From Swiss-Prot:
Origin superkingdom: Eukaryota
Entry GO CC: chloroplast stroma
Name of the molecule in the record: Stromal 70 kDa heat shock-related protein, chloroplastic
Keyword Membrane: no
FT transit peptide: 1-67
GO molecular-function terms, A-Z: ATP binding; ATP-dependent protein folding chaperone; unfolded protein binding
InterPro entries listed in its UniProt record: ATPase_NBD (IPR043129), Chaperone_DnaK (IPR012725), Heat_shock_70_CS (IPR018181), HSP70_C_sf (IPR029048), HSP70_peptide-bd_sf (IPR029047), Hsp_70_fam (IPR013126)
Amino acid sequence: MASSAQIHGLGTASFSSLKKPSSISGNSKTLFFGQRLNSNHSPFTRAAFPKLSSKTFKKGFTLRVVSEKVVGIDLGTTNSAVAAMEGGKPTIITNAEGQRTTPSVVAYTKNGDRLVGQIAKRQAVVNPENTFFSVKRFIGRKMSEVDEESKQVSYRVIRDDNGNVKLDCPAIGKSFAAEEISAQVLRKLVDDASKFLNDKVTKAVVTVPAYFNDSQRTATKDAGRIAGLEVLRIINEPTAASLAYGFERKNNETILVFDLGGGTFDVSVLEVGDGVFEVLSTSGDTHLGGDDFDKRVVDWLAGDFKRDEGIDLLKDKQALQRLTETAEKAKMELSSLSQTNISLPFITATADGPKHIETTLTRAKFEELCSDLLDRLRTPVENSLRDAKLSIKDIDEVILVGGSTRIPAVQELVKKLIGKDPNVTVNPDEVVALGAAVQAGVLAGDVSDIVLLDVSPLSLGLETLGGVMTKIIPRNTTLPTSKSEVFSTAADGQTSVEINVLQGEREFVRDNKSLGSFRLDGIPPAPRGVPQIEVKFDIDANGILSVAAIDKGTGKKQDITITGASTLPGDEVERMVSEAERFSKEDKEKREAIDTKNQADSVVYQTEKQLKELGEKVPAPVKEKVEAKLGELKEAITGGSTQTIKDALAALNQEVMQLGQSLYNQPGAAGQAGPTPPGSESGPSESSGKEGPEGDVIDADFTDSK
């Protein structure tokens, strides 16, 4: 019977992705799984790569995608943005509505139509249960991890059979994975980018919070696949911001990126200069963002109303949505005003009649409501500086990223912590997408002389004796990296072992994130301690983990499938990809149907107008034919298919052409009203025209026929 408590660790090998794993020496000491090797037997390096000059890196490590546009996407909790390299500079791409950012909102109407972006956000109050926002807070997570977040939204967050998060959509009787909703936002961004660039976009660099764990990164990549995108690279948001800030800057600087978005908080310390962007450390909190500040205002408003009226507005989905939107608006206004008026008429009704909310929120009261959230911003900043082995005096610039950094109390806190005014030369809503575009340009070969060295945000390890986490790859290890551990059996004839892979910084398994467990079967029966199974952990440049195992005795490589992770299984992703393609096809067909119908309506109107204007000038047989085809087109518009409308439209156009021809074939057609080619208007005849006083002024009627 295999158990994680019955595995021998025979030694540890640590190596970069450039080197082969060192062989295990014959005299390596055997110890029980769960014991730490001393420093002589555990040669972990702090980073996969030592500090190298940019010249060293410029020779390799670059994935090239030739002659194809690669975009950078900031997939945000509240808003998303897309950018591309244009004319050698990163440029924000405006969406179909002409906006530089797109709300990360997806909605389904009662008739099954899907809305994405601003149009979805506008109807949230009247359709709260089918409007999905802040979905990024649920991506790649188990239901047990999002208890607090699930109470902040107006839609139902449910648990599936594996304990993963699903979002219920009663309008179409379906539940979605968070990846599917995010994929629909990505799809809109890419479609809008394709139109803007006049080139089909299929490849992208997508950003994630620096403190996202492996499951969340994998889920984000899956969202890209479902959207029909090839995600070439997942990069951290603070790192992307530094790329945008440091692009084309030559001087060396140590910068701290303070990234407070709608749902997450990250802090990264980087060395930037001469094209090299090296992340020294990163820290953060994936349960802290602008949504939490909004929630404090919502709770305050709902609490006061319950005290005065005895009604809990948080149980009313529509009222909750109105409160949430009002709280966000009030928060934004308090960034420039000392107080704001909150007015919510007809928020609910009782037997006594309709009830309203009319109150004033001051900036001081807002800061009081959010005081503990502001305190939570301190620790990641301090941790990041400590891990980078730097003091506040070593920081040259502080870059603010994310819309929530506009809150005056946040800016004041940063100033107190670092001792200098933040740099305000970058747009906090756009800088991440711009940085992603720079990285996209590097991968596409449009940008050279840039080297990016990122780090793993969280430690990676295994469950060992007593429910303890033994760290294999420590946090802030430069990526990509690869480390291995050699295991053996703890019992004679043992043929399998089971290992739980963990990510986090706490000492005990229960306090860390389980990425899943794998069972290694097929070990040849042998006395205990004889088999040597090397388990290798690889973290790629995206920060995504893969695990492999090799039986060192036979050289046989075992395929390991991690189970129980909070990401979607492969077959589920494939199903969602095909479903998204089907939806995309249906959307195109719906759009074509609408465009065809609109065109047909316009032709009907123009034809009827033309018949009315021409009146008796149209020969009766021709008029009858046109009217017959007009009737057929009207019938097709009322209940016909798109193809039927197209056929009827073509037939009507043919008859209208005949109508025009018949007008010109009539005697005296030159004087008839009708479509006249530009420049062919004739002057007055000798008998009827009159010259003006100067002999060059003509009395005539001018008809502009279009």
